[in-house]
Every structure is written in structure tokens, then in C-alpha cells.
Amino acid sequence: MAMDQKRLDRINELAHKAKAEGLTPEETMERQELRDAYLKDFRSSFRSQVEMLQVYDKEGKEVTPEKVKDIQREKGLRDD
């Protein structure tokens, strides 16, 4: 988590510098690499949260999408 915050802080620092005075080519590359890494981690975390999700209707019947159920079965998270 601390690494994510450091990465995010550096992305923001480079964004402020880009608006204020511009970035060197090296800083532009660094910013893009940091953004790509951050987005990769974010997407992975989000996917994990969605894969753990179970959806129920008002009557209490599970209505989790089949695609999510299949992924949960593959990962051993579901017995049915």
C-alpha cells in the first residue's frame, strides 16, 4: 500500500510540474510508466473485488451473473 501511495504522489508531482513548467522527455516517460503500473494494479484490485461479489435480489435469491459465477468456480470460491 505504501508503494502505491508513493507512486501516486510521484504521478501527482509530475502532473503539477507538467502544468507549471513542462516535463523533460525522461520525466514524461517516467510519468507514463508510473501511470501504467498504477492502472495495472488498480484494475487487478478492482477485478478481484468484482470476482468476490455475490448479488441478491429483493427476495434473497442469488442473481450473480453466470460469468462471475464461472470465474468463482475456477478459483475455488464457489461449490455449486
UniProtKB/Swiss-Prot annotation:
Annotated Gene Ontology cellular component terms: cytoplasm
Keywords assigned: Cytoplasm
Principal location class: cytoplasm
Gene3D superfamilies: Helix hairpin bin
Localization per record: Cytoplasm
Cystine bridges: none
Region Disordered: start-end pairs: 59-80
HAMAP family, A to Z: UPF0291
The family this protein is said to belong to: Belongs to the UPF0291 family.
Name of the protein: UPF0291 protein LCA_1274
Organism of this sequence: Latilactobacillus sakei subsp. sakei (strain 23K)
